[in-house]
């Protein structure tokens, strides 16, 4: 690994993508900016899961959560406090070039998983986020803690598209009809049972942290208005929402009578309907593991909605947030997650793209920066703020590998952008990884520093 030079708080220029001509300079706190913190010292020994071995609480054989004083922790199966330093989409692309590179360098998927999990451990990571190659991970003689994502709404969405002709006339960026989640449809319940029941295969595995259900479901602020004004009056969703509205406002109430208080109350009912369905099936098939939520992501909608977080706290063990549009997490915003829900949170997506990567970087929600070194500074700045909050129990960088830019079958928002820790051919970005390692190797000491212990 390269030696990381000592630097204090710095300025880093960033922009949304290469189509934005101007750059903005952001204050960026690095590890070396922590006054009095001894950067040369690393964390004490970790247990096999990556937990803080020097401290012990009740061991249940599975991952759980616990608040100790004013700080939240994940507690690993051996009873040690654990911060989930993870990587999303720990998997290999499907293009011919990527598969050839896999065979040349690792021979098999199992060989790749063994080698790259060891690489991640050397970098101070201790877990794997959504969309990872779970089958290969579980076959390893030395696996890493991992997560599983099941997608009942995502699967039902495909059927719903076919039902309404394959293309919606009005839809948001996730391509949901009228930007509404179909939580009230009786057909959705069938997909909940089919998809969520799959968790039974993992219920006894101590290496599993927990489950996500779906990703970035649209929870628009005016969902009540849209249900009552855009849906046909014989649709199950309209009938369910009209019944709720009548009970709240009276049968003579009209959509024009909707207030912001009504919208907030409905958003709670709307989310509760989804979460009550998925968690009932989840707990039936696996009572042992954590429920990590449905990956909230919209600042103008659910991430500022107190009523929705209050509901989330009743069902989720940890609130998952895909965190974009903020260079540094806003301390009031992220502590509100815990204040409103009574639960800790985890950042399940965040990243920057380096314009020195030879990729166009025209898509994706993460920031563009000039260099891989600056990607590493962003990582330190972002994670330091999360650790200081005391209510964040981990983060998952998005993602392990750049897509092959020649593979036209990949998701458009990922295709041409430098989101990975390694290139499409497994070649690492050392300047980024060195700075990730510098923070990851000192996480528990950083927590002691922030907690004044």
Short names for language-model regions:
Residues 77, 174-186, 194, 204-307:
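Polysaccharide-binding and catalytic clefts of secreted carbohydrate-active enzymes
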Residues 139-172, 205-209, 213-251, 405-421:
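Aromatic- and acidic-residue-enriched segments that line the glycan-binding/catalytic groove
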Residues 208-210, 214-215, 350, 364-419:
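Substrate-binding cleft of secreted/luminal carbohydrate-active enzymes
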Residues 13-149, 155-210, 256-270, 276-277, ...:
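Active-site-adjacent substrate/metal-binding segments within catalytic domains
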Residues 228-239, 398-453:
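Aromatic-rich peripheral "rim/lid" segments of glycoside hydrolase catalytic domains that contact
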Residues 1-9:
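Bacterial Sec-dependent N-terminal signal peptides
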Residues 127, 143-147, 207-212, 288-292, ...:
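Structural preference for beta-strand elements that scaffold enzyme active sites
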Residues 256, 265-280, 284-364, 384:
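Glycoside hydrolase catalytic-domain groove-lining segments
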